[in-house]
């Protein structure tokens, strides 16, 4: 039997009088791909926004089964969903930092563990051992994912200078840098050609 990773029950999201999600229930299994399919405006992105803490759902529940814990995603503030629950996402419209390098975009994704290692103090600037070790680890993780998508040679280039398909791949591996327990991809193949879609 497949282990459940995510349980969403009676999820509702209202914006004033507009009902964006109406009593949605579904589950996702561990190590499986689950798709949310619907026309434009059906609320697919809103579901991801609720799962990742960008929106607080009006009603319903969202539970993530992580190791020996059952985490209530509604209890986490937005950035804590990624940090504590291990939920990462990509966006329908690519959201990179275009003036930052390709490598820096991947390092930014790992800022929570770097901040934790510095003790949220200035010690990180003075080469505190834990910070330096975590920084090296973050660079190695970034290099690993750049190698996977074939962009190691572009590591120092501005992310905004990459072709569209490479930007899409970079956004996906940026989410992978935190080793997510749940990865939400919002129209990940949008704008990709057939070859790029197959690679994805």
Task: Describe the role of every protein-language-model region.
Residues 2-200:
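Glycine-rich phosphate-binding loops of nucleotide-dependent enzymes
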């Amino acid at each position: 039997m497949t282990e459940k990773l995510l349980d969403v029950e009676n999820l509702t999201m209202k914006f004033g009088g507009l009902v964006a999600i109406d009593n949605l229930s579904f589950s996702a299994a561990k190590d499986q791909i689950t798709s949310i399919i619907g026309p434009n405006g059906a609320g697919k992105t809103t579901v991801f926004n609720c799962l990742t803490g960008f929106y607080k759902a009006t009603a319903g529940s969202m539970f993530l089964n992580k190791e020996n814990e059952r985490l209530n995603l509604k209890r986490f503030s937005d950035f804590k969903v990624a940090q504590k629950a291990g939920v990462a996402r990509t966006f329908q419209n690519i959201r990179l930092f275009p003036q930052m390098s390709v490598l820096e975009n991947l390092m930014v994704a790992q800022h929570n563990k770097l901040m934790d290692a510095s003790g949220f103090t200035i010690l990180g600037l003075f080469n505190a051992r834990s910070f330096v070790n975590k920084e090296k680890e973050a660079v190695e993780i970034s290099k690993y994912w750049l190698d996977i998508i074939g962009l190691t040679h572009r590591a120092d280039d501005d992310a905004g200078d990459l072709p569209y398909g490479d930007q899409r791949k970079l956004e996906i591996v940026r989410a992978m840098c935190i080793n997510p327990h749940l990865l939400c991809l919002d129209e990940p193949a949008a704008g990709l050609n057939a070859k790029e879609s197959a690679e994805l």
